[in-house]
Every structure is written in structure tokens, then in C-alpha cells.
């Protein structure tokens, strides 16, 4: 089931959980979507700022599988 997250802090907390498997990054012209797959939910965070999105991408945990979708 999908669930949207509004805060970057909450997204990073979810990314550090044990059941977090993979992150998909979808880039559009206007925004960047980060979708993290956990055991129960697919959490989505929408970031409008491109610089903020790059910072967030670098701050993801190293053990997490990252896949970029265009």
C-alpha cells in the first residue's frame, strides 16, 4: 500500500529501518520522487528543489539498494 510522507526527516527515519529494502528515484522536470519499499508500505516523498533532492540522495543509508528511474 502506498503512503505519502511530507517531511524529509520522517523519510530518512523510514530509510534507516530494518525492513526498508530499496529506494526508487523518479526525476521529472518539476520535482523528484523518492519511493522507499518497506515490508508493509511504499512510502513516497516528493521534493521540488533539485539541490535538496541531490543532498537527500547522498544522505541515504549505504546498505540500501538505489534505483534511478527516468
UniProtKB/Swiss-Prot annotation:
Concerning InterPro entries, the annotation shows: Ribosomal_eL38, Ribosomal_eL38_sf
For this record, the Gene Ontology CC terms, alphabetical, are: cytosolic large ribosomal subunit
The GO terms describing molecular function are:
structural constituent of ribosome
**What is one GO biological process annotated to this record?**
translation
Spell out the family assignment given in the record's similarity comment: Belongs to the eukaryotic ribosomal protein eL38 family.
Full protein name: Large ribosomal subunit protein eL38
Q: Write the record's keywords in alphabetical order, separated by commas.
A: Ribonucleoprotein, Ribosomal protein
Amino acid at each position: 500500500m502506498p503512503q505519502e510522507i511530507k517531511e524529509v526527516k520522517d523519510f530518512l527515519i523510514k530509510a534507516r529501518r530494518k525492513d526498508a529494502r530499496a529506494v526508487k528515484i523518479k526525476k521529472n522536470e518539476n520535482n523528484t520522487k523518492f519511493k522507499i519499499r518497506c515490508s508493509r508500505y511504499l512510502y513516497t516523498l516528493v521534493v521540488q528543489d533539485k539541490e535538496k533532492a541531490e543532498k537527500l540522495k547522498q544522505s541515504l543509508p549505504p546498505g540500501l539498494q538505489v534505483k534511478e528511474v527516468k
